[in-house]
């Protein structure tokens, strides 16, 4: 063994295992690239990013710690989000929460095993898929 050496299993490391995912489509409507880091409260991401913000409340990107997703101007892509764990308190970012997560606002699919979760938008005609994103 070498001092400071970390010996890991030869299998892949799973991150956010057993955390329900929410997939949303995001578009950069701004004129500059936007990068969002792994632990950033996605609900509070740059206002030039167009997406269903309420579905991102209490969640961050499902990517390795220290990584980020970059959105070039006009880019449209799907991202996968997971809920914050631990004490579930959010401070800083854009100052929109600054305290405990309001659990009543956190979107959760109703049944991960169904083909569709049966969750509808405010007007009742906006179907979403089991991962929480809009159906096309």
Curated annotation (Swiss-Prot):
InterPro entries linked to this entry: Urease_beta-like, Urease_betasu_sf, Urease_subunit
Protein name: Urease subunit beta
Record's compositionally biased regions (Basic and acidic residues): 102-111
Cited Pfam families: Urease_beta
Region of interest (Disordered), residue spans: 102-136
Catalytic reaction(s) noted: urea + 2 H2O + H(+) = hydrogencarbonate + 2 NH4(+)
Top EC class of this enzyme: hydrolase
Pathway: Nitrogen metabolism; urea degradation; CO(2) and NH(3) from urea (urease route): step 1/1
UniProt EC number: 3.5.1.5
